[in-house]
Structure formats: structure tokens, C-alpha cells
Amino acid sequence: MTRNPMTVFAIVPVKGLDNAKSRLSSLLTDDERKQFCLKMLEDVLRTVKSTRRIHQTVVVSRDPAVLRIAEAFGVVYLKEEKTGLNEAVSEAIGWCVERGATSVIVLPADIPLVTPTDLNRILALGEKASMVIFSSRSGKGTNALLLTPPNANPTFYGPNSFQKHIQEALKRKISLRKLRSPRIALDIDTVEDLKEFVSANAKESSAYKLLDKTGILNKLGIRDS
């Protein structure tokens, strides 16, 4: 049965940027990695803001640079008070519920290829399922999680989160849909991930433009044309 129209809030948790994306250290300096994380966040926020069915966007972090980006995009910034990603997400979900959210979609800040079409697809699936979940490329991580209502399932971000989310949903006997999408699946952690991102030819993305500007494309053996 299709539910009443959803009031959807998006939650984008952002980890501390000190020593972020350390597996890219062979290619990017500390500052370049930090800037790359911020540019990926910009891409994700731009997509979320372009998805009309999302009523409000909440960024959760304790990094001042993330605060500045949240302000620039006109989204809510919640300072992370709890230690641990799941605690921070839980706190953000509570904030959303208090303000009328009937659904929340949790998105990582490092999936710069995600599009409004992807998010609208997730929201459409959420009209008939309490949990919609998309995996990472490895099949182990969770790269998109829609919960209706927001407390339908606790979160288990960390190792093997995809399977843990599903196991808990089955235990609770809530309706769920599990899917994959190449764009959503690509979270950039390694040099191979970075090459995959560049090959997607997302030249209009902030993340891609940074790679071009800083000469990283040349380091990868790629010249922008």
C-alpha cells in the first residue's frame, strides 16, 4: 500500500577531515585530500538540494570547514556532539523527527556521482518499503539508506554495515528493498576508486574540477580535454 506523501529530510554525516582519505596519500597531499573531501561534499549537497522531494538537508560534523560549506549551501549544520558515526546519525534523526520528518535518507559525503534521478528513484521505492538500502561497490558498506519512519531501523555504520542493516530489518520484520547503483556505489577511498571516478567523465563536478586544477589528472596519466 502506498503511504501518504513523505516529508523527507536528508542527513549527510561528515567525518573529521584530519588525515581524511589516507589511502589516497600516495597521490594527494594532506591538504589536497581535505579539499577533495570538501568538493565531494559540495557535489552531494548540490544533488540533494536539486531533489525537490527532499524538504530539508542536515549536515552532521565537527569540522569548521564543513560548517562553512553547509552555510554556503543554505543547509542545516549540526555540530557532532556524540563520538561515533551511528550516535551522530541517531542524534540527527531525532532532530529531523522533532521537525516533522516522516522519512530520512542518510547519504555519505563521498559519493560525488549521485544524481537527483538516483535520489528520486530511492524516494519512489520508499513509498512502499520501510527501508531502502544501496550498497557500496564492495557490497559491504551502505551508501544510501532511506528509513520510513525515521526510527524504522537503527543504523550500523562501520564494517559490514550493509548486511547488518538488512539483518536487523529482517529481525524487525519491516519491508525492505536492497539495490545497487554504479553511481551510488562509488565512494572514493582508494586510487582505483579515484580512477573509476575520473573515467565516469563527471567534468562538471566540483571534485573533478579540483583534480584537474591541482594536476592530479596528470598524475593519473589523464589530460583533460
Predicted regions and their residues:
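Short phosphate-binding loop-to-helix
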Residues: 71-103
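Acidic donor-binding segment of Leloir-type glycosyltransferases
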Residues: 52-77
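A short, N-terminal amphipathic alpha-helix
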Residues: 37-53
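Conserved alpha/beta core of the MobA/IspD/sugar-nucleotide pyrophosphorylase nucleotidyltransferase superfamily
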Residues: 168-225
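Conserved donor-nucleotide/metal-binding helix-loop-beta segment in metal-dependent transferases, i.e.
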Residues: 114-139
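Short, glycine-/small-residue-rich phosphate/pyrophosphate-handling segment
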Residues: 147-169
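Short aromatic-hydrophobic micro-motifs that form the base-stacking/packing surface
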Residues: 105-107
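N-terminal nucleotide-binding beta1-loop-alpha1 segment
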Residues: 1-24
